[in-house]
Curated annotation (Swiss-Prot):
Residues 393-447 are annotated as: Three zinc-finger-like regions. It comes from the Eukaryota. A zinc finger (unnamed) spans 393-406, 412-426, 433-447. This is Nucleic-acid-binding protein from mobile element jockey. SMART domains: PRE_C2HC. The gene is gag. It comes from Drosophila funebris (Fruit fly). The lineage of its organism: Eukaryota, Metazoa, Ecdysozoa, Arthropoda, Hexapoda. GO terms for molecular function: zinc ion binding.
Length: 574
């Protein structure tokens, strides 16, 4: 390794040439690579100790963790005599040794140095911690390739190293046998496009915020901006004050250490998002209500109709279609049957004759549901059903937000590494969940954190309010107003009882008493009706238990009778 070499060879312009070079390097023996990495680390450690003893500058440092991983970080500081770049080179020696560059080849080391220099130039947020720490220990299950054994080991902190170092260290493991390797370039490009569309860069000017009025798009309340791992809240307040002023926001910190920033209007919300993005801060937020599209489901239109035709059809009605999506479903009628296990497997999915269309918000957007014809098709336009699922980010795989509004370093859903899911950098056979630390992927449907959030999303059943509570409340309110509730009208009274003088009320009293005796539940107040109902249910359950016992005894008696008949038939002379 050249510690002070500031000149690096540039990357090949063609990606195929780069991959071909990596394939040539991957032909080395893994055992040889392992020994070379360990020897290089040992020599680096000795040189670092001698350099630190004889100089006042910060020179290479070597760290070794408890899970047999070896990390070598080389940093060349800026001195008065010379100014060089910052390089970060790391290698991991674990249960599965991936294809790594042998010592002495400068092509991959130069590539890693360039990526490390790019990560170093990104900068650091002044009020945010460099790494994302976790207080709970996570259990990891190591599944070794071509073996049956499973070794359980414990990792105390998955994100102790900064994401920039982890990203640079993962470049040494470009070539692998990962099944998601074919999706690497596509996943990276998609995520870059998402960030470019939804997150503003630092080169754009922050718009002037008028704090004396609400946003022109609508008076809706802006969502919270969540900033994790804030170690210097005073610096955060200074950054927000310089952006939108001290009377335009409020902060609330949760028990998990996430600082939620609430702004007074949409203009302040957009200004804070752009300012935090320019500071290279890691945070996430949600979409403004006025920016959310109006999603409708168009039924009755053929699946092969071009999207441009649908856009023109909505434009004729005065609506702007932002996005059009045709859902797919499995075609079980044309499924192929595997010869090995005789199980039907779906080989493709067919498009449904339905479209989900995102329309731009407007004052008359609700009239889109009255559309009955689009072009030559008679259609039915309905409001798209809301998905009752847990929202999970496909970038950092944390629940509660989406990838389009996540400005955090990517985390792999398989190994919890600091790289995109499905990229060439994922070469580990370790499954690690980001949310619970279990030995499964972060997108697993059986994750206990996901199950708990689903349980909280379901509405809890409400118990019926007893009648006596309502009646008593009404009676108390009537008494407070000075009204006396009228007496109940007595029933079962004859003509003689009505015309009898008031002094003799024997028959009427007897009639009422006889009514009470005939209906014992009448003596109970309305508050005891539930107790009486519960008692009746218990009696019914007891009777049902007795009935089940009688039925069981009857079945056993019939069985014994049949056996007796069979014995008698067998003893009869032929």
């Amino acid at each position: 390794m050249n510690y002070g070499n500031s000149s690096t060879r540039s990357l090949p312009s063609d990606r195929s040439a780069k991959l071909e070079e990596m394939r040539k390097i991957a032909g080395a023996d893994p055992a040889t690579i392992r020994s070379q990495i360990i020897a290089s680390g040992a020599s680096t450690s000795n040189q670092a100790a001698s350099l630190l003893a004889n100089s006042a500058f910060n020179y290479p440092s070597v760290t070794t963790s408890s899970d047999t991983s070896f990390t070598c970080t080389v940093t060349t500081s800026q001195a008065s005599c010379a100014s060089t770049s910052t390089y970060t080179v790391a290698a991991r020696v674990g249960p599965n040794i991936c294809s790594t560059t042998p010592v002495g080849n400068n092509s991959v080391s130069d590539t890693m140095a360039q990526m490390a220099g790019k990560a170093a130039r990104k900068g650091k947020c002044s009020f945010q911690a460099p790494g994302l720490s976790s207080s709970k220990k996570r259990k990891v299950v190591v599944n070794a390739c071509q073996t049956i054994r499973k070794v359980k080991m414990q990792a105390t902190d998955l994100r102790k190293a900064t994401p920039k170092v982890a990203t640079a260290s993962a470049t040494a493991t470009t070539m692998s046998n990962n099944r998601f390797a074919a999706l690497a370039l596509e996943a990276d490009n998609v995520m870059e496009q998402d960030l470019a569309e939804n997150c503003s860069n630092g080169e754009e000017d922050v718009p002037v915020v008028n704090m004396n009025r609400q946003s022109t798009n609508g008076p809706s309340k802006p969502p919270a901006i969540c900033v994790p791992n804030v170690d210097n809240p005073h610096s955060l307040e200074q950054a927000l004050n310089s952006c939108v002023g001290d009377n335009s926001y409020s902060i609330r910190t949760s028990k998990f250490g996430v600082s939620r920033i609430y702004t007074i209007n949409a203009d302040a919300f957009r200004a804070v998002v752009k300012h935090l993005t320019s500071l290279n801060c890691q945070f996430w937020h949600h979409q403004l209500r006025e920016d959310k599209p109006y999603t409708v489901a168009v039924k009755g239109m053929h699946a092969n109709v071009p999207k441009a035709q649908i856009e023109h059809a909505f434009a004729d009605h005065g609506f702007e279609a932002l996005n059009i999506y045709c859902p797919r479903k499995a075609d079980w009628r044309n499924a192929q049957v595997s010869e090995d296990d005789d199980e039907a497997t779906v080989n493709f999915k067919t498009r449904q004759n339905m479209f989900f269309v995102n329309l731009k918000q407007g004052p008359k957007i609700a009239e889109a549901l009255k559309i009955t014809q689009l072009g030559r098709y008679r259609v039915t336009v309905e409001r798209a059903p809301r998905r009752r699922e847990v929202l999970q980010c496909l970038r950092c795989h944390i629940f509660g937000h989406s990838k389009n509004y996540c400005v955090r370093d990517p985390i792999c859903a398989k190994c919890a590494g600091s790289h995109m899911t499905g990229s060439l950098l994922c070469t580990s056979d370790i499954c690690m969940c980001v949310n619970c630390g279990g030995d499964h992927a972060s997108t697993d449907k059986d994750c206990p954190v996901r199950i708990e959030k689903l349980r909280k999303m379901k509405p809890s059943p409400r118990l019926p309010v007893p009648d006596n509570a309502t009646n008593n409340k009404h009676n108390r309110a009537s008494s407070a107003r000075g009204f006396i509730p009228a007496e109940a009208v007595r029933g079962n009274m004859s003509y003689a009882d009505i015309v009898r003088p008031k002094g003799s009320q024997f028959r009427a009293t007897a009639t009422i008493n006889s009514q009470h005796e005939s209906n014992p539940l009448h003596d109970l107040g309305s508050g005891n009706k539930f107790l009486t109902l519960e008692k009746s249910i218990r009696e019914i359950n007891g009777r049902m238990d007795q009935l089940f016992k009688l039925v069981q005894e009857t079945v056993e008696a019939n069985k014994a009778f049949r056996e007796l008949v069979q014995v008698l038939i067998s003893r009869m002379p032929k």
